[in-house]
C-alpha cells in the first residue's frame, strides 16, 4: 500500500498556498484602503482642531487603544463590565470549548495562571461531555431508523433518511437560522451572522464578532444563556458529524478492500490466472534464496553412506528379499576370503616367538604335517567351540534387508581368526628392502641348498629376529612354501653378509 503521508503533506501545503493567495487578493486591497482612510481622517482632525498638534493626537490615540485592549468601551458614555458573573460565564465557556474569541482575556498574573490550570482540566472534561451528547443524538437517529424499518422502509432508505435529517437539522439549527436572530439582537447583516455562527461552531473564534457583548445593545436576560446553549449543541453536532464522516470513510475503505479481495479470488479461480501463476512460480524458482543457501546443512560422510544405502535399496527392487547389487561378493564386488584363509592379526613389539609357536603356526597353515595325536587334540577344541561368526558387508546387508543403514550403529569388523603377523622392527628396515631381500634369499636358497642345510644346524629356534619387516601378509603363494625353505630363508636373513 502506498504511504499517504507525503501525499497528505503536499495536499495541506497546496491548500494553504491557495488559501493565502485568495485571502491576499480579497483582503489586501481593503487593508490598503483602510490605511489610506486612517491617514486622511487624522489630517482632517488636525485641520479641524488646529490647536491640537500631531503629538497630542498620537497621545489620544494611544490612550484609546490601551483602553480598548483592557476591555473598556471607548465609545459612548456607558461602560460594559466584561467580568460580571454572566459575562464571566461566557468567557469560561469560550475557554473550555477552545473557542477563545480573544475580545476578553485575563490581564492580571493570577488570572492568567488560573486560566492555564482551568483550561488544562476543563478542556478534556468538556470534550468528553460533548462526545457523550453527540452519542445521545446519534442514538435518537438510530431509533428513528429502527422506527422506519419497522414501518416497512428498507434499510438503505432508512439510513439515507436518517443521514439527511441529521445533516439538515444541524445546518438549519446551527448555521442558517441563527444569523436571523443575530440580525435582530446584534444589528449584523446575514453574512456577518453566518460568519460568526461558523467561526463559533468550528471553534476557530477570531473574536471580531462576539454575541452579547455590545454595550449599546439592550439584551434579554436569557439571551446570553441561549447563546451558550446554542454553542454546546453546535459542538455536539459537529462532533457527531465528524464521527459519522470517519465511520463513513472506514466503511468505504472496508468495501474497497472487500471488492479487491473478491476480484483477487475471482482472478485466482480463473484458468488463465492459474497458468500465469504457474509460469511466475517457474521463473521465481530460478532465483537463489541466499538465506536458505546459507542455512543448508553440509553433507557429511554418514549422509553419503545413507545415500548409497538408499540407492542400493531402490536398485534392489524394494520388495525383494534376495541380495541386491551391493559392493560385496553377492553383488559382484570383491570376493570374500573363506573362513580357513582369514588372517590372524598378531602384534608383538619386543617378544620373540618360540619354536613351538612357529611350528604350531606352520602346522595350522598346512606347511608341516601333523601326527594323528596332534590332529585329534587340535580337532577337539574346534568341535566344542562355537561356530565362527560370518561377517558381511554392511552395504550388502542393506540390499538384502532393504532397510536404510544408520551410520551411528556401524561397528568395524574385527576378525578373531586372522593370521597376519606384525613384527615390530627396531632396525627400521622398510617394506621395499625387506621384499627385495626375501626375493634374493629365495633365489639363493634354490641355487645352494647345501649351504642352507649347513646354516640350519646352528639355528636357535627360540629366537626370532627383531629387525624383520614391519608388515607381513600371508597369501596363497606362501602357503605352498615347504618348511625347510622357510628355515633356509630365515638363516640367510640372520647370517652376516660377509660369511
From Swiss-Prot:
Residues noted as binding K(+) 2 in the record, renumbered to the chain: 99-100, 204-205
Biased composition (Gly residues): 316-334
InterPro entries listed in its UniProt record: 2pore_dom_K_chnl, 2pore_dom_K_chnl_TASK, K_chnl_dom
GO molecular function: metal ion binding; outward rectifier potassium channel activity; potassium channel activity; potassium ion leak channel activity; protein heterodimerization activity
Ranges of Basic and acidic residues composition bias in the record: 370-382
pH behavior: The homodimer is gated open at pH > 6. The heterodimer with KCNK16 or KCNK17 is gated open at physiological pH range 7-8 and increases current conductance at alkaline pH without apparent saturation.
Residues bound to K(+) 4: 98, 203
Any one biological process term the GO annotation gives: potassium ion export across plasma membrane
Region (Selectivity filter 1): 98-103
Catalytic activity: K(+)(in) = K(+)(out)
Topology with respect to the bilayer: Multi-pass membrane protein
Binding of K(+) 3, residues: 100-101, 205-206
Tissue: Abundant expression in kidney, also detected in liver, placenta and small intestine. In the kidney, expression is restricted to the distal tubules and collecting ducts. Not expressed in proximal tubules or glomeruli. Expressed in pancreas, in both endocrine (alpha, beta, gamma, delta, and epsilon) and exocrine (acinar and ductal) cells.
Superkingdom classification of source: Eukaryota
Activity regulation text: The channel conductance is stimulated by extracellular alkaline pH. Inhibited by quinine, quinidine and external acidification.
Cytoplasmic domain ranges by topology: 1-7, 134-157, 251-325
A GO cellular component entry from the record: plasma membrane
Keyword terms of this UniProt record: Disulfide bond, Glycoprotein, Ion channel, Ion transport, Membrane, Metal-binding, Phosphoprotein, Potassium, Potassium channel, Potassium transport, Transmembrane, Transmembrane helix, Transport, Voltage-gated channel
Function as written in the Swiss-Prot or TrEMBL entry: K(+) channel that conducts voltage-dependent outward rectifying currents upon membrane depolarization. Voltage sensing is coupled to K(+) electrochemical gradient in an 'ion flux gating' mode where outward but not inward ion flow opens the gate. Homo- and heterodimerizes to form functional channels with distinct regulatory and gating properties.
Record note on quaternary structure: Homodimer; disulfide-linked. Heterodimer with KCNK16 and KCNK17.
Assigned protein family: Belongs to the two pore domain potassium channel (TC 1.A.1.8) family.
Description of its domains: The pore-forming domains 1 and 2 assemble to form a single pore in which M2 and M4 transmembrane helices line the central cavity and M1 and M3 face the lipid bilayer. The transmembrane helices are bridged by the selectivity filters 1 and 2 carrying a signature sequence TxTTxGYGD that coordinate the permeant ions. Up to four ions can simultaneously occupy the selectivity filter and at least two elementary charges must translocate across the filter to convert it into the open conformation.
Name by which UniProt lists this protein: Potassium channel subfamily K member 5
Originating organism: Homo sapiens (Human)
